[in-house]
């Protein structure tokens, strides 16, 4: 088909124009203002703008300083909000929300998260806000090239080890969703908006995200039809239930693993309150998107991973909660993935990696899956 997305240069995505050579001195000066006794650390950049995903900058650092006569060496990770000129995926980045959620999850649950250390919210130091957290050693199923393409530690593992990782990741999600009274504990995520349901507020945010994405790349008739479908098929029962803490970008590509067990749950940019079905559907749908990518590359992918029946059964066994129908949430996830592809496509145009497409939907690697979910032919 003429508008079929091409795999092309998916193995190379430029995320930032930041000059990392200036970082050691800048971060050293800032750290001296937050470390005990005003210690002046020596800072080394271990890797530049690195990310398992396609959004915030992730910079790995080592800081060395003297404290109470002792030599301290700490490996840290800086999560830095992208600059507007680097075509960010999201309209806004609340790193303060991410920092506080990670801190609370670490305090309230046994879900493995990095220890968050310090946050700079003004943007005066690096040009945009950032926070520092402890570095955690682990491996992640890759996004680029997608883990479903094979030739990586997860795809090449025995099926029982893949299932072990899947179940452990669903268990982390189940634990997050079991934090009691999430609406009060994480009330800062509502930003004072208490009218309507959390799902309605989330939907309005996604609609504004799409409008933001359109500015850089053009409108999508498929997405606009999908928004109408979502409104006319609104999941009233799921929307009315007590909201839980949503990880947001809940998928295996945002977890560090050791021996097929999670050691750090990462990437909280989409954190929100809402129906638990949204996180579960996103986790399954994310794998389906990667399966679509494998299919476009004429590869078999990993069809036995993240099957809905398996994920549902594991989740219910751990929480005692029977999930509602996930179909609406798959369609909704498809819209959000399309917004990501619109913004990463606009970024690739900005950095000269591709020409601006005539048809924005040529960027949607999962367009066929979306049309199938909507009952449209493709």
UniProtKB/Swiss-Prot annotation:
Binding of Mg(2+) 2, residues: 267, 269
Record-listed Mg(2+) 1 binding positions: 254, 267
Key words of the record: Antibiotic resistance, ATP-binding, Kinase, Magnesium, Metal-binding, Nucleotide-binding, Transferase
Annotated GO MF terms: ATP binding; kinase activity; metal ion binding
Enzyme class, UniProt record, top EC level: transferase
Function description: Might catalyze the phosphorylation of aminoglycosides and confer aminoglycoside antibiotics resistance.
Protein name as catalogued: Putative aminoglycoside phosphotransferase
Organism: Mycobacterium tuberculosis (strain ATCC 25618 / H37Rv)
